[in-house]
């Protein structure tokens, strides 16, 4: 319930954003330049995605289960009525209501009244109206741990585990969404570059054709210009298909708040603020700090809490190896007012009933089996934790090394692309001076385009890796 209230607050904070997206879907503001930033995209994902809602529901279920676990300590009212008549003779008629109050330390307090009438009844029973209060105390088995305490302790740990499991779900979902977003950005940038080159090649083809008809260019130049235009047209088709697929893939993460999926409109494009971030900011990571952060990864915390759960189970199973030795004491009173005899403080002189119950399986086969299994579960969980921690550390190191390499590649590719651009401009100048050919200019341009495409791909990988590092330490929330 608390988390749903928080969700309502989040809905207020992102109201304008959702309205913005809904307007997309309804076709409003089509004349406006509509863009979607990564932050806007992730806000929608976090607010409306069914997977996150399911994770929140799992947390709420864990909260409710604690209430169920507390029922083991809930006071109860019990009652019994019995009567026997045989051969037109009433043997007995008994009525016995009772209140029982379990306590945290295994001690159970109780009190009740009894009304026994008839002609034939057990000599150990008290005839007429009587009352009693008493306690039952475990002296060995169930003294330090019992199923009620174990269930409640474990349910509280399960709640903490469900919170960390929710963080794991959110961490994984956001990483998948981020990867899809940067693929969307990447395909859009490549399509934009190719469209720009296609438009330029169209202008060049028109210019060459006019020059050919004016006798200024050879026919071979028109063929060269036409081939380049056709090649860019082909690349544009490929780029549009890739962008369409990336847009549809991005749409799989987008949902309305009424659990209805929606598709990102074609008119929407990625926000260009990331280019400023790339130019002005350099993210720095310190490997040792990342490895320290990985120690509190939600997956690691889940296994640590699971160990506590299994340790409680082991404590409970150990109780099966102990003999059951329970002491009980009832203070009795005539009539329904047992309080009068309690005030006399003569608890073991008069008006009392006491006893001891003892039970012990001779071979303890079930107890030994259950305890051994509980211990093996703990060992397996510790082994799983070691493996998971190692896997997380290796992922952190892998993404960190990839990030460091991509930083260098990015700087190098900027230089390569800039150099190719200079070669294109120089070749175009030589063409204007009659010292080069259109074929060479086109060749230079293709190499410059290849360098730019590679630069765009590296930029997308660079941003993906930044978020992958955060994902590897479990910090995407």
Show which residues each predicted segment covers.
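Metallo-beta-lactamase
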Residues: 239, 298, 381, 458
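Bacterial Sec-pathway N-terminal export signals of envelope proteins
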Residues: 28-90, 140, 144-148, 154-156, ...
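Small/polar, glycine/serine/threonine/aspartate-rich low-complexity segments that form flexible
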Residues: 31-33, 80-137, 268-282, 315, ...
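Membrane-embedded alpha-helical bundles of multi-pass transporters/translocases
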Residues: 62, 73, 100-103, 111-112, ...
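Amphipathic alpha-helical coiled-coil segments
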Residues: 42, 54-69, 169, 173-194, ...
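Periplasmic alpha-helical coiled-coil/stalk elements that build and connect Gram-negative outer-membrane
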Residues: 7-10, 157, 164-289, 402, ...
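Sec/SRP-type N-terminal targeting helices
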Residues: 53-57, 70, 104-128, 139-170, ...
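Bacterial Sec-dependent N-terminal signal peptides
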Residues: 1-33
């Amino acid at each position: 319930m608390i988390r749903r209230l928080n969700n309502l607050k989040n809905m207020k904070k992102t109201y304008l954003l959702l309205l913005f997206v809904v307007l997309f879907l309804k076709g409003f503001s089509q004349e406006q330049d509509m863009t979607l930033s990564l932050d806007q995209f992730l806000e929608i994902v976090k607010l409306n995605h069914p997977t996150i809602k399911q994770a929140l529901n799992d947390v709420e279920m864990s909260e409710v289960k604690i209430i169920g676990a507390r029922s083991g300590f809930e006071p109860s009212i019990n009652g019994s009525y019995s009567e026997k008549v045989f051969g037109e003779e009433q043997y007995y008629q008994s009525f016995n209501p009772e209140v029982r109050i379990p306590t945290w330390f295994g001690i159970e307090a109780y009190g009740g009244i009894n009304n026994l009438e008839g002609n034939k009844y057990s000599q150990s029973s008290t005839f007429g109206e009587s009352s009693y209060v008493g306690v039952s105390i475990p002296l060995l088995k169930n003294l330090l741990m019992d199923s009620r305490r174990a269930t409640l302790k474990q349910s509280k740990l399960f709640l903490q585990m469900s919170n960390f499991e929710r963080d794991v779900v959110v961490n994984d979902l956001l990483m998948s969404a981020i990867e899809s977003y940067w693929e969307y950005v990447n395909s859009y940038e490549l399509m934009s570059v190719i469209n720009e080159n296609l438009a330029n090649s169209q202008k060049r083809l028109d210019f060459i054709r006019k020059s050919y008809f004016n006798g200024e260019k050879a026919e071979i130049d028109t063929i060269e210009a036409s081939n380049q235009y056709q090649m860019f047209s082909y690349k544009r088709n490929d780029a549009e298909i890739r962008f369409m697929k990336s847009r549809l893939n991005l749409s799989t993460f987008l949902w309305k708040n009424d659990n209805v999926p929606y598709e990102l409109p074609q008119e929407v494009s990625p926000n260009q603020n990331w280019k400023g971030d790339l130019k002005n900011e350099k993210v720095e990571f310190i490997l040792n700090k990342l490895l320290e952060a990985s120690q509190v990864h939600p997956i690691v915390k889940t296994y640590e809490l699971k160990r506590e759960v299994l340790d409680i189970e082991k404590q409970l199973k150990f109780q099966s190896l102990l003999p059951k030795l329970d002491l009980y004491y009832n203070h009795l009173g005539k009539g329904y007012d047992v309080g009068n005899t309690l005030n006399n403080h003569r608890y073991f002189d008069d008006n009392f009933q006491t006893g001891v119950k003892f039970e012990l399986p001779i071979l303890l086969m079930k107890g030994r089996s259950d305890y051994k299994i509980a211990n093996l579960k703990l060992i397996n969980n510790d082994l799983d934790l070691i493996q998971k921690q190692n896997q997380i550390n290796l992922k952190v190191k892998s993404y960190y090394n990839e990030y460091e390499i991509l930083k260098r590649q990015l700087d190098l590719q900027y230089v390569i692309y800039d150099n190719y651009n200079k070669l294109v401009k120089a070749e175009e100048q030589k063409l204007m001076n009659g010292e080069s050919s259109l074929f060479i200019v086109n060749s230079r341009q293709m190499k410059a385009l290849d360098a730019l495409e590679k630069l765009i791909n590296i930029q997308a990988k660079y941003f993906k890796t930044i978020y992958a590092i955060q994902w590897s330490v479990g910090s995407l929330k």
